[in-house]
Amino acid sequence: MSRLLKYFVLSLGLVATSAFADNVRIGFVTTLTTPAGAMGRDMVDAANIALDHIGHKMGGKAVEFIVEDDGFKPEIGKQKTDKLVKQDDVHFVTGFIWSHVLLASRKSALDGGKFLISANAGPSPLAGKLCHKNFFSSSWQNDQNPMATGEVLNKKGVKKLYIMSPNYAAGKNMVAGVERTFKGEIVGKDMTKWGKDMQLDFSAELAKAKVSGADAIFVFYPGPAGPAFIKQYDQAGLRGKIPLYTVFTVDALSLGRLQKAKLGGVLGSWNTMFWAPDLDNPTNKRFVADFKAKTGRYPTHYAAQSYDAIMLIKSGVDAVNGDTSNQDGIRAAMLKADFPSVRGKYRYGSNHFPIQNFYLRTVKEDANGDWFVSHVSTVLSDHQDSYHGQCKL
C-alpha cells in the first residue's frame, strides 16, 4: 500500500479531498487526542454532516476539508495553523476549542490573509481590541453564557454563590461573566490548575463549598474535568443541598458517561447556552436527527457551532460564485448571517460576534431514557457581548 493511500485510510474520513486545484479549501484545527479529543471529534463529525448536507460543494466548487490536531497545546495549534496557511494554502481556517490555542494561532491565519472562524473559543480580546475584519465567530464570546447564568441565579433567588473554574483565559472570562450579572454575594472562588496537568481532584474545593453557606455552586469545567467534577459533587453529598449551575460542563459527551456511572446528581441541574438539541426549527431538527443517526448520540454545542461554521462559510462562497479571491464579497455576505442556522436567525455585531438569544436548559431523560439537555426558556434576547465597543472595525 502506498504511503499516500495509507494516509487516506488512516485519516478515517477526517480529510475530504478534491482533484481540482481551484477547489474551496477549509482547514479545521481542533483537539483529537488527549482526553479532550472527544470534543474535537464531535466538531469534526458535525462539520462532515454539514458538508454532506451541501453535497461537499460551495459556490459550485468542490470543498477540500483538512483537519489538524492541536493536541490541546497552543504551540501545536499555531504550528498546525501555519501548515494550513503556508503549505495547504487554505481559504478558511476554523475549529478551535480552546481560547489559549486560538489566541496563539490567530496571527498565523489573519496575517496570512485567510479568514479565521472560531467554531467555539470566544476570548474577550478577539471581541474587543484584537478584532479583525477577517475574523468571525460561529459561537459566542466567552462571557455571554455565564452572564445568562447570572441572570438565572438572580431569578432563582440565589443570594450566596460559590464559584469554581479552571485558571486560564476562558475560565477567567467565564467567572467575569457571571460576576457581571449576579447581584448576590460570592462567598468563595477557586481557580484550579489547567492544561497538561489539569486538576481533576476537587475534594478540597467541594469541602469548602459545603461549609461556605452558599445557596448555589457555579462551575465551568469543559472536557474531561466536567465528569470528574460531577462525580465528586455527587459523592460529596451536595445533590439536593446546594443546587448546581454550570456552563460548558454538562453536554451530550459528559452525560453519556455520567448516565453509565449512574450519577443522577446531574439530573435537574441547570445551564445556559445559545442552543439546545430540542430548539424548534427545521435546520436544527434535521441536524440533530442526522447527527444521532450517524453517531448514536446527541450533538453537543461544539457540534452545533461547527455545523454553523460550515454553513456560514458556504454563504460567503456562494455569494461570490466560488471566487475565493473576492474576500470583500465573502466578508459582506458572511456579515449578513443569511443562512439556515441550527440556533435560528441571528445577526453579527461590528466585531463579527453573534448577537443572539441565550436559553436556560436543564438535564432530563428523553422518551428512550437517555439523558440530554433540554430548552426551558429564553434568558437573554438578542444579546451582544460586552467588548464590542472596544473593536475599531
Please identify what each model-predicted range represents:
Residues 233-307, 318-324, 363, 367, ...:
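Extracellular/periplasmic periplasmic-binding protein-like sensory domains
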Residues 38-45, 53, 57-126, 138, ...:
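Beta-alpha junction/loop-to-helix N-cap segments that form part of ligand/metal-binding clefts
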Residues 70, 117, 124-127, 239-259, ...:
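Venus flytrap/periplasmic-binding-protein-like
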Residues 27-46, 68-75, 97-98, 164-172, ...:
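Extracytoplasmic "Venus flytrap"
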Residues 84, 88-97, 117-119, 160-165, ...:
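Periplasmic-binding protein-like
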Residues 79, 124-127, 132-236, 277-286:
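Extracellular/periplasmic Venus flytrap/periplasmic-binding protein
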Residues 7-16:
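Bacterial N-terminal signal peptides
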Residues 17-21:
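Sec/Tat signal peptide C-region and signal peptidase I cleavage site
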